């Protein structure tokens, strides 16, 4: 709920518990088998929490997900919500892109970016804003070491916001069955920046 044309009550809080519950319900309703959960950024946390709730998965792919819960992270997350409130996703993307994307991806985005006329604040009851605000309820103190399924960690080096190398190393080392892929020419949005390479690695 909250995505595109989905329906939800204006009074409903699209918090972490609801998002994870929706994921679990969708998987159970469709009776999906032999799945691999793939999550970008906080989506990887939601996927991991679904495993905690008993969802059966053959593996887990975490794309620029790993980070430690601290004042810096909370500051970043709350600021993103505030920016979206006053300038919408266009301002949020323009603000973030130079510090989360590779130079080549910035060049691709530039023609449609940095246009102040696109800066329109999100209404509080829109799905995207509710999801962003709900993301603030996420608990990043998850015990990653409890994950039993094989994990593939993808990290983009041009992500200067969420990529703290030492923190990622510490979390990755705590996991039981991990493979790591480093993308020196990508940032936070690996599936958008290098879609072919991303798909190839998933298929492998």
What are these regions (language model features)?
Residues 160-167:
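Conserved alpha/beta-hydrolase "acid-adjacent" motif
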Residues 1-38, 200:
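Active-site loop/oxyanion-hole signature of alpha/beta-hydrolase fold enzymes
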Residues 45-52, 56-87:
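Flexible "cap/lid" loop of the alpha/beta hydrolase fold
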Residues 172-189:
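Catalytic histidine neighborhood in serine/cysteine hydrolases
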Residues 71-73, 89-145:
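Conserved alpha/beta-hydrolase catalytic His-Asp/Glu region
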Residues 186-199:
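Catalytic histidine-centered segment of alpha/beta-hydrolase-like enzymes
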Residues 39, 43-44:
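Catalytic nucleophile loop
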Residues 147, 153-155, 159:
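Short beta-strand/loop motif that positions the catalytic acidic residue
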């Amino acid at each position: 709920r909250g995505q595109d044309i989905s329906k939800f009550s204006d009074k409903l809080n699209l918090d972490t518990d609801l998002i994870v519950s929706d994921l679990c319900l969708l998987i159970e309703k469709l009776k999906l088998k032999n799945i691999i959960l793939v999550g970008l950024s906080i989506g990887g946390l939601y996927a991991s929490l679904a495993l905690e709730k008993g969802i059966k998965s053959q593996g887990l792919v975490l794309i620029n997900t790993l980070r430690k819960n601290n004042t810096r992270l909370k500051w970043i997350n709350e600021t993103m919500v505030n920016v979206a409130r006053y300038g919408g996703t266009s301002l949020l993307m323009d603000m973030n892109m130079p510090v989360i994307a590779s130079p080549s991806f910035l060049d691709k985005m530039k023609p449609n970016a940095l246009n102040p006329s696109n800066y329109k604040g999100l209404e509080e009851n829109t799905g995207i804003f509710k999801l962003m605000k709900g993301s603030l309820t996420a608990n990043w103190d998850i015990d990653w070491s409890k994950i039993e399924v094989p994990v593939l960690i993808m990290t983009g080096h041009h992500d200067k916001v969420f990529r703290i190398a030492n923190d990622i190393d510490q979390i990755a080392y705590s996991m039981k069955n991990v493979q790591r892929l480093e993308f020196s020419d990508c940032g936070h949005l690996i599936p958008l920046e290098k879609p072919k390479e991303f798909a190839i690695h998933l298929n492998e």
